[in-house]
UniProtKB/Swiss-Prot annotation:
It is an enzyme of class 2 (transferase). Belongs to the MnmA/TRMU family. Its main location: cytoplasm. GO terms for cellular component: cytoplasm. This is tRNA-specific 2-thiouridylase MnmA.
């Protein structure tokens, strides 16, 4: 894994240095394999003058310290306007339409593997780019497949399904072959200051702020009723955009007379009436679906699964694989029938398909299929 391969010598790799442990170790491993490595730090969000929610300055400092330790150059680039136009505006539009988007997927598509790759190509003359994502690449019959990362708990293929096989072919994913614990061990052994740095969680542009506070600065909230699935009004919500299907916490519903002790879940967002519909129990019938329709399809190899294929999918990150059968309603709409009913499938999120270890691609969940 870390021995020099003569075919790598002279090949230039630009590593996306985030200031975290995964990109730090990626740069180190690629150097050990004989590549000519340089780092590139992206700034994707302009923080407020007073509150640096994304901690970009700290991350840049850590990235620079790692590059200094490894003896490699660190370049910087500002993609804030591209991020605003292609990721953030999409994020707001989806919330406004009552759906729950995944900005990380759009960031990978538009920024990390598009704007970054173009900059690395045109300005830095790269042969490859590399990221600290937990996925693997396999080259077979002239195309590059994307496989799940070895560490099943950290596998990030769900967030990368929009990549083309051409983008995968230009990308290296060194830590995808390792467990997270091994990555931290390597960083510690090499004396990299990021070895015990906490993994970033949540959405970069929100940072430590409360999600509701952040969203309300961009979209006006429209309070409305909370109703049971039987139509009884039992409370008020501050805005449908703050809630997602299957949500249990933060509903503000106390104990009600003549109701069981089972927790309440969001089972529907009625956009026409501006009503949040709730039901009791994680297996509430209104929470379950037997399948879905997805559109905005993207296949890593451009072909996609065959009509009638029995494969698996994930409708959210870290979900267990769901066995399913797929058929096509059109070139850009896939019909998915689950082997067993699934709870809290959410329009606006991504359905990502797998054939064993191979990430095939996916699409955006549009409509739920219920009996």
């Amino acid at each position: 894994m870390t021995s020099i391969d003569p075919t790598h010598l002279g090949k230039k790799v630009i590593v996306g240095m985030s200031g975290g442990v995964d990109s730090s170790v990626s740069a180190y491993l690629l150097m050990k394999q004989g590549y000519q490595v340089e780092g590139l730090f992206m700034k994707n969000w302009e923080e407020d003058d007073t509150d640096e929610y994304c901690a970009a300055a700290d991350d840049l400092k850590d990235a620079q310290a790692v590059c200094d330790k490894l003896g490699i150059k660190l370049h910087t680039v500002n993609f804030a306007s591209e991020y605003w136009d292609n990721v953030f505006e999409y994020f707001l539009a989806e919330y406004k339409a009552g759906r729950t988007p995944n900005p990380d997927i759009m960031c990978n598509k538009e920024i990390k593997f598009k704007a970054f790759l173009e900059f690395a190509d045109e300005i830095l003359d790269a042969d490859y780019i590399a990221m600290g994502h937990y996925v693997r690449r396999r080259d077979i019959d002239g195309t590059s497949q994307m496989l799940r990362g070895v560490d099943g708990n950290k596998d990030q293929s769900y967030f990368l399904y929009t990549l083309s096989h051409e983008q995968v072919a230009r990308s290296l994913f060194p830590v995808g072959e390792l467990e997270k614990s091994e990555v931290r061990d390597i960083a510690k052994e090499m004396g990299l200051i990021t070895h015990d740095k906490k993994d970033s969680t949540g959405i970069c542009f929100i940072g430590e702020r409360k999600f509701t506070d952040f969203l309300s600065t961009f979209l006006p909230a429209q309070p409305g009723n909370i109703e049971t699935s039987e139509g009884e009004v039992i409370g008020q919500h501050q805005g449908l955009m703050y809630h997602t299907l299957g949500q249990r916490k933060g509903l503000g519903i106390g104990g009600l007379k003549n109701s069981s002790e089972d927790p309440w879940y969001v089972v529907e967002k009625d956009l026409v009436r501006n009503v949040l519909v709730v039901g009791q129990g994680g297996n509430h019938p209104r929470l379950m679906s037997n399948g879905l329709l997805a559109n905005q399809l993207h296949w890593v190899d451009r072909k996609g699964p065959a009509e009638g294929a029995k494969i698996t999918l994930k409708t959210r990150y870290r979900q267990h694989d769901v066995p399913c059968t797929v058929t096509y309603d059109s070139d850009d709409q896939i019909r998915v029938i689950f082997d067993e009913a699934v709870a809290a499938v959410t329009p606006g999120q991504s359905a990502v398909f797998y054939d064993g270890e191979i990430c095939l691609g996916g699409g955006i969940i549009d409509v739920l299929i219920r009996d």
